[in-house]
Amino acid sequence: MDYLPIFTDLKRRPCLVVGGGDVAWRKARMLLKAGADVRVIAPVLNQAFQQAIEQQQVSHVADEFESSHLDGIFLAIAATDRKAVNALVYQSANQRQVLVNVVDDTQRCSFIIPSIIDRSPIIVAVSSSGKAPVLARLIREKLEALLPQHLGRMATIAGNFRARLAKTVTSFSARRQFWEQVFDGRFSDLVACGQEQDAKQELINLTQSTSPQGQVALIGSGPGDAGLLTLRALQLMQQADVVLYDYLVSDEVMDLVRRDAELVCVGKKAGFHSVPQEETNQLIVKYAQQGKRVVRLKGGDPFVFGRGGEELEVLFDANILFQVVPGITAAAGATAYAGIPLTHRDYAQTAMFVTGHLKAESDQMDWSTLARGKQTLVIYMGLMKSGHIQQQLLINGRAGDTPIAIIERGTQKKQKVIKGQLSELEQLAKNAESPSLIVIGEVVNLSEKLHWFGKQEQSLQQSAVVKLA
């Protein structure tokens, strides 16, 4: 081990920064964040330093560095572009037994500054001992993605509860088991949802009961590309005991679920066995009441034609804790991957999202509004009703030559885009499979320039050739 990682309390300790440029300011800002009394030595300062001095955050000596500037200093950092000055800072600090760091010169460092993941009071430091700083930064980025933002709040609440716990739970091993249960259970989810008073009450409840309480996370998995999954969604998926998922959730996303989680398909798809919504609701409640951490995983966003609101109402009535993690809805994700902007100053000032899967057989659509020009119309689950959609839009005034696109499996490796005109919609839909999104409006033509992902768009004629072949 080349260096011993030590976390140092710098609050109100005098720390010196030599240099007045951008690099020196980054180091000074880090010291300020740790509560240090920062002094800067430099003839000239950048604007950030000048603002900090005006706000009395740092003190400044407008002079060249001298050894006497280290008198009474706890820690020093040299960040100038002059090797002779940096060497003098290092030599002078060593003579006074002052900790010193010369930026980008490990030979002149008695300490080095690691890459930091700050979830105060939880702090994680990553260092390559100065050998590969970029690698250390990449490792830090990966850890940033894995560590939830609410870790610090969890640690603070837990720290304030430790003394109280010691009075009621005297055994060290029992206290350890208590905290393991706390940090892997409902307490964590309450803090993540900003319900800190309930989280504190949960700690009290856990000292009086050993039965775990279940919770549900309603998660949007996005349109298919696992890279579009949110960090929060990934964290919860890897903590789940049970995952109830739809057919629209891609295999890529399902591969990221915790390996030993129970997987339950509750999807609905034409031609396949479908689980009624009422049965899905009952399953979610059942698993949560067993004390399990349940993930309800939906394609796209759960609140955009996903019936997420209905499922949460059932959980509310059953007094079960829940949280919602939004996902990128197909209208945003699939169109972006197809090179179709939803709005454009020249072509569309409005974007409307509607579902083609109507309740029962009633048609409650305001077709006169949907048929307006200068807007983009995005239709979810519209393939089976494509003929009706085409007919109603034409009857209500939308031009037959309005550009349209059907995006099949948007954002996924098998994405296919079929383009044509509104007058061809019903015929085009015969060449597409679910899940598909219908986009209607002049913005579709922009995909000729903006298309960047997957197969090139197919026209009606190309699709017909494929079918004949």
UniProtKB/Swiss-Prot annotation:
The modification Phosphoserine is found at S128. CDD domains: SUMT. PROSITE patterns: SUMT_1, SUMT_2. InterPro entries: 4pyrrol_Mease (IPR000878), 4pyrrol_Methylase_sf (IPR035996), 4pyrrole_Mease_sub1 (IPR014777), 4pyrrole_Mease_sub2 (IPR014776), CobA/CysG_C (IPR006366), NAD(P)-bd_dom_sf (IPR036291), Siro_Cobalamin_biosynth (IPR050161), Sirohaem_synt_dimer_dom_sf (IPR037115). The active site is at D246, K268. Residues 1-203 are annotated as: Precorrin-2 dehydrogenase /sirohydrochlorin ferrochelatase. Transmembrane segments: none annotated. GO terms for molecular function: NAD binding; precorrin-2 dehydrogenase activity; sirohydrochlorin ferrochelatase activity; uroporphyrin-III C-methyltransferase activity. Residues 214-469 are annotated as: Uroporphyrinogen-III C-methyltransferase. S-adenosyl-L-methionine binds at P223, G299, G300, D301, V304, T329, A330, M381, G410. It comes from the Bacteria. One of its GO terms (biological process) is methylation. Its EC number is 2.1.1.107, 1.3.1.76, 4.99.1.4. NAD(+) binds at D22, V23, P43, V44. Pfam families: CysG_dimeriser, NAD_binding_7, Sirohm_synth_M, TP_methylase. Pathway: Cofactor biosynthesis; adenosylcobalamin biosynthesis; precorrin-2 from uroporphyrinogen III: step 1/1; Cofactor biosynthesis; adenosylcobalamin biosynthesis; sirohydrochlorin from precorrin-2: step 1/1; Porphyrin-containing compound metabolism; siroheme biosynthesis; precorrin-2 from uroporphyrinogen III: step 1/1; Porphyrin-containing compound metabolism; siroheme biosynthesis; siroheme from sirohydrochlorin: step 1/1. Keywords: Cobalamin biosynthesis, Lyase, Methyltransferase, Multifunctional enzyme, NAD, Oxidoreductase, Phosphoprotein, Porphyrin biosynthesis, S-adenosyl-L-methionine, Transferase. It catalyses: uroporphyrinogen III + 2 S-adenosyl-L-methionine = precorrin-2 + 2 S-adenosyl-L-homocysteine + H(+); precorrin-2 + NAD(+) = sirohydrochlorin + NADH + 2 H(+); siroheme + 2 H(+) = sirohydrochlorin + Fe(2+). In the N-terminal section; belongs to the precorrin-2 dehydrogenase / sirohydrochlorin ferrochelatase family. Then it catalyzes the NAD-dependent ring dehydrogenation of precorrin-2 to yield sirohydrochlorin. Finally, it catalyzes the ferrochelation of sirohydrochlorin to yield siroheme. This is Siroheme synthase. The lineage of its organism: Bacteria, Pseudomonadati, Pseudomonadota, Gammaproteobacteria, Vibrionales. The gene is cysG.
